[in-house]
Amino acid sequence: MADEPLLSVERLSKRFPVAGRRGSFLHAVDDVSFTLAVGESLGLVGESGCGKSTLVRLLARLIDATEGRIVFEGVDLAEIPAKRFARTPQRGAIQMVFQDPTDSLNPRYTARDTIREPCLLLAGMDAKAADARVDEVAQQVGLPQALLSRFPHQLSGGQKARVGIARALAPRPKLLILDEPTAALDVSVQAVVLQLLDRLRRELGLATLFVSHDLNVVRLLTDRVAVMYLGKIVEMGPSSAVFADPAHPYTQALVSAIPGHGPRIRLDGEVQSPIDPPPLCHFRSRCPAVQGRCQREAPPVRGGGHQVACHFA
């Protein structure tokens, strides 16, 4: 059906066994659900350790899920073992732009080799078509032809970022996962790369999952935003609504750190352990509005377009 989402994540969880503690598990991603439409941009925010990176690895099929579904264009990718996913048609349809372009580029490959490889391996192009595609995406990302023969150590940070973006675009994906794509770049280059990514998303009709610590960037460049805390999505909705009127106490604290968003809310208390967490509110030890009910039961997810997991929001 035309109104079906491109991606539907349903009750996705990832638990890692804890060494030396038989029967104990670290709940990195805990019962996460969301959808992503064709051409839509979803931001993913939260403190370090909240589960963003694990969720990205699950969606990119780098690791297997413990439970749940990852339905992409009607196919449940969670049923395909991560080791086999690279040989499926969906591999080229889901691509990543990594946090550090230097670490993600093969030092023995020229820029042309790097962009050409997914054309051959993922898109099934012949050599002539692959070379033509390299030239096409190089032009799209603003990478001069003269730079295509250079190796990573001969490129600037911004140029390496463009190579990484071109590599991701080469097999004509439908979903781009942007994992802190400018975190390793100089501030002077970050804005240029972000503008490039936003323009390409709109021109090519790409769906994007944008992972970032920069809340201002997420607010400006995404249609919706999901806020994660200890493996769970605690709030999700239109970016404009979430940033203008955050409903969850954790989101309120995050947004208060943005200049011009009212007085800063500082969180006290200890972060709960993600190892074998009880079925209660994960935020209860730091929440300034905690009540007895929070200590007895997990909050349900409420709302339609703007969802929040809090008893009292």
PLM region spans:
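ABC transporter nucleotide-binding domains
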Residues: 1-244, 308, 313
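Short catalytic/signature loops enriched in Gly
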Residues: 3-5, 19, 25, 236-313
